[in-house]
Amino acid sequence: MHAYTLKAPAKINLLLEIIGDRPDGFHELVMVMQSVNLADIVELQPLSGDRIELFCNHPQVPCDQSNLAHRAARLMQEQFPGKGGVAITIDKKIPIGAGLAGGSADAAAVLVGLDLMWGLGLTQAELHTYAAKLGSDIPFCVSGGTALALGRGEELTPLPDLDQLYAVLAKYRSLSVATPWAYKTYRQQFSESYARDPEALEKRRREGHSVELLAAISHRDSQKVPQYLYNDLEKVVLPEHPQVQEIRDLFQSFGALGTMMSGSGPTVFGLADSRSKAELMATQLQTALPDPDLEILVTKFCSSGIQLLS
């Protein structure tokens, strides 16, 4: 068996609309997800027996069974017994606790890598099925690009690529927002707006905030797409964390094509149509907020998910 090295891109949400509750306790969502070039590098090496060993260069990333990458390897061993063990090495580039799906991307890389290493020949639909057992973002991280995501996020429809856009990502390293808290607080404050039956849910899917954004994406209109960014979770996170609102306001004042908090945060992104404009915006933000705790990264939209490097 060969070793494999894979690129695992981060993702941002261009749209996150909460439209109702699900029987499983999760929310019914309408999302548009987007891969970016910022990525972890995940290396897989075969091991004898059924050992799973995990290594990461970031001290705050757990290397035990709580890590999604470890759980992905265990799931694959359970589904395909006797294929052997694996050593997983993660070179962490995606900020942790940032709402950028770094852990989900690593798990997706393990699924794709073990499919290759073990010669399973799984289809993308089969990979998505296993990914959905692990987490809502992981099916998207497998295939990446630009996609409409429904349900918990596992029902994916590919959309035209938007890889001409750049994003400046900004996050205070010491700030984290617990995703369960964000959704629970939203439910407490806004559940009266939820769709209550299948017909109402379908109507919200067809006629909600995604309509204009999906139309702009269908035309690959890089000027209009940023005008239709939308995230329901901003309603609960921004009042609680004014420093996130401040970054958003600054991106607007610097002339970003669009700006929004990604997912449950706390990362905020500002969009530009060229690298030079994105880098200027990053410099302006650094000057306005010269705080060493603030991490600022310039990246580009990309059109694929997990990529084989070697």
Curated annotation (Swiss-Prot):
GO terms for biological process: isopentenyl diphosphate biosynthetic process, methylerythritol 4-phosphate pathway; terpenoid biosynthetic process. It comes from the Bacteria. It catalyses: 4-CDP-2-C-methyl-D-erythritol + ATP = 4-CDP-2-C-methyl-D-erythritol 2-phosphate + ADP + H(+). The keyword Nucleotide-binding applies. The keyword Kinase applies. The active site is at 11, 137. Pathway: Isoprenoid biosynthesis; isopentenyl diphosphate biosynthesis via DXP pathway; isopentenyl diphosphate from 1-deoxy-D-xylulose 5-phosphate: step 3/6. GO terms for molecular function: 4-(cytidine 5'-diphospho)-2-C-methyl-D-erythritol kinase activity; ATP binding. HAMAP family: IspE. Catalyzes the phosphorylation of the position 2 hydroxy group of 4-diphosphocytidyl-2C-methyl-D-erythritol. Belongs to the GHMP kinase family. IspE subfamily. This is 4-diphosphocytidyl-2-C-methyl-D-erythritol kinase. It comes from Acaryochloris marina (strain MBIC 11017). The lineage of its organism: Bacteria, Bacillati, Cyanobacteriota, Cyanophyceae, Acaryochloridales. The gene is ispE.
